Amino acid sequence: LVGKAVRFVLWALVAGLWALPVPLAASQRVQLVRVGLLAGRPEVVLSADAPLRVLDVQADRQEQLSTGAWAFRAATGGIEVPGVARYGPVVRVSAEGDRPVRVEDRLRAYRGVVELRRTEAGLTVVNEVDLESYLYGVIKLEINPAWPAEAVKAQAVAARTLAVASLGRFAREGYDVRDTTDSQLYGGVTFEDPRATAAVDATRGLVLLHGGQPILAVYHADSGGRTESSEHVWGRAYPYLRGVEDPYVSGSPYERWTLSLPTGQLEEVLRRAGLPAREVRSVEVAETSESGRALRLRFSGPEGAWELSGHRLRTLLGPDVLRSTLFTVRVEGAAVVFEGRGWGHGVGMSQWGARGMALRGWDFVRILQHYYTAVQVGARP
């Protein structure tokens, strides 16, 4: 941090109550985040409710376009607004008065700067925005902002931490994070919500730290009763991503679910994975983790038996199809039937569990320290 050390005060000096960090002052160094929105586009239409300022980075020249919608096209060696202007390979577009810039192709408006980059594939669109404003556009898409405020605050801290830990992840593509589940869902100003904004502001600058560094604060919808240790999903054991009991989930629509999949569809998926699955006659869970999730599945048919990890199967089927790897499975006639619990990879914070804890009076620090082992809530480095 620049200047004075960040100060903390105790929310209470009574045994059993939690020490709540004070949100950071506005003087803290501003962290910019570059969010990849689109790639490979021949044309991108930008607009605003104010004149647009267009900075040609190569020429170091700024021009102004009147209020309205303008089409930016990929041209040889650069970018053009047909019949109006021609620029180098990178332009940075903002609006007078710091008004949001709309990317018509996404039907969304964004704070900060919208950057267009000419690549071999076309135009890449990047939103460069300060970290806290980025979070304004994340929270509503990742959690219900009508939930108890402490759960939404916990989400804000987890999302901020994950964003900081992910800076530079897609540097080769010209940005830090994507606006999809590859990173975190992000909808710009269009998806801001006053309750989400309040949660971000109430926790401004606070992140989860292990060894003084921001952690990989992944999260998911519903653990199904127990979270998972990271090595069982991504092959690497993080000391702060350990499986824990998650007993306070209530009212989740994902608590129990059933998926019936035609055997032919499953066989096609397995063949795409390189397995000789001409005919599947039986399926069983061959190994589970401590949380009960399927680590290995064994399939058998006329060609013999073969195995696939539960995580790999979920990836192949799609995470919205096979909601989690916490399931039992059987062949029933011409279908393979999965009966499971929860939704998501199961690592880190369970959002429905956080909601249940908040309903019981837990504050956001206590919620976070339940899901992330041996972490501190403190100032962003």
Model regions and ranges:
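Conserved, single-site charged/polar hotspot
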Residues: 5-13, 19-381
